[in-house]
Amino acid sequence: MLHYLKKMKKKIFTYFIAIFSGIIGVLAFSPFDYWGCAYLSLLGLIFVAKTAEKKTALWSAFLWGLAFFTFGINWVHVSIHQFGGASVVVSYVLVLVLAAYLALYPMLFAYLIQRFQISSLAMFPVIWTFTEFLRGWLFTGFPWLQFGYSQIDSPFAHLAPMFGVTGVTFFVMWVSAVIFNLLSVLLIKPRKWNVVIANLLLLTLVGGLSAYSSKAEYVRKIEDRDLLVTLAQGNIEQNLKWEPEYLYQTLDIYHKLISQHLGKTDVIILPESALPVLENHIQPFFQGLQAHAQQAGTEIVMGTIYQDKTANKLLNSIITLGNTDFPYSLETTNRYSKHHLVPFGEYVPLETLLRPLGSVFNLPMSAFQSGDEIQSPLVVKNRQLSAAICYEIILGEQLRKNVKQDTDFILTVSNDAWFGDSIGPWQHLQMARMRALEFGKPVIRATNTGISVFIDEQGKIVAQAPQFIETTLTHKVAATEGQTPYAVFGNTAIYGLSLLLLLMRGFGALIRRRLFMPRL
């Protein structure tokens, strides 16, 4: 009986560590930005994953993931409840279901560690990279809350231009494993100082790599290609945005914001689907804007909803107005259409089966089709803008296919009003900052209710509009030329390193087996 109670006490303690460390992992991300919490959280995950009892290890890793994702993506319930018509209880239940699914990946991480009795420090980031790849790929993927994003303001941030956020995440797990090993050794008597020194050298190596990258000049600013850009933040409430009677008020708001800056700035940028009406249905409005913008010498970039009747597609698009080389028309080639759509938000999988089940599967504008994966950059004032709409900015590898050496800026437009005053928009902004650092390109981010910002090529916010205010934000943005290693090679380097480490471990295990195999 005493043995059973002791065992239960140990199991409960392990579960507590899992839940606690999962929760504090969220504090590493915006808006909290305590980047050191990423290492504390992963230390907890490694601890529970290496628990002697396999079943406890698996369930503990699942609880870690459940706690981490439940608190980290709780903002999903806002759109489900407020705009999907579901009750508060149902919306939170759906968040738990999503979190439980995402928790399967940390559980898989623990399973692989238990299955192959992993003790090698190098294998922890390799396995984590594999499970994170699956999370970002299966069922269209949901690569939200990768720990690499949390390091945007840390000393390890400059690994991003070399390896991307996947690589930064790899090194965060590696450093966490090194710290775990270091703490384990320090608690053992007599201490193995050679192991301590080896661990410290590994930490120095990762830090040195980041320091080297911070000094490297992968890109350079082109001062004579700068642009004076104005962001128009309409602050249209999401519950009013799609009401037909509110359309004219929305048109008035953006007409006013545009008029204030016509002729005074190079470019005015409006957010994703700025006007809640088909672009096709208000052609006189757009033709009028085209004429006024062209006369004033200011170009307008705007998110629209476009019906491509030739291809029979409803597209989430970005267009330009006032461009003399690409005069506006419905058939203009100077258009970007969103490729990666959000399941249930922009399209409904198994539509004929799910839509009849309830309003939660009938969010406004959830019937879009995809644009092409690779598209030409938008040409604005003879500058090249590689575009990403809303969720697409979190997909570094997709954006990499469209960011070229002669790309001047990255443009992202969004409507984060779907998520209210939750932490979701801040996490979204943090990922946009990482894209700037990865590619060495300034990011211009225009949103409906915030957070509208200008981000420099180092991933730093240089100008920011207040959230939930109808306003404009103007800033001179300097273009950059050149490419970072990540822009050229993508995730190839970090996947190659993972494969190399995996082969080295396999080869080492084979050698040990041969050496200690009894001879007949």
UniProtKB/Swiss-Prot annotation:
SUPFAM superfamilies: Carbon-nitrogen hydrolase. The active site is at 272 (proton acceptor), 338, 390 (nucleophile). One of its GO terms (molecular function) is N-acyltransferase activity. GO terms for biological process: lipoprotein biosynthetic process. Disulfide bonds: none annotated. Its EC number is 2.3.1.269. Pathway: Protein modification; lipoprotein biosynthesis (N-acyl transfer). The chain crosses the membrane at residues 12-32, 33-53, 58-78, 93-113, 122-142, 168-188, 193-213, 484-504. It is a multi-pass membrane protein. Residues 232-479 form the CN hydrolase domain. It is an enzyme of class 2 (transferase). Keywords: Acyltransferase, Cell inner membrane, Cell membrane, Membrane, Transferase, Transmembrane, Transmembrane helix. GO terms for cellular component: plasma membrane. It is found in: Cell inner membrane. Belongs to the CN hydrolase family. Apolipoprotein N-acyltransferase subfamily. HAMAP family: Lnt (MF_01148). Catalyzes the phospholipid dependent N-acylation of the N-terminal cysteine of apolipoprotein, the last step in lipoprotein maturation. This is Apolipoprotein N-acyltransferase. It comes from Pasteurella multocida (strain Pm70).
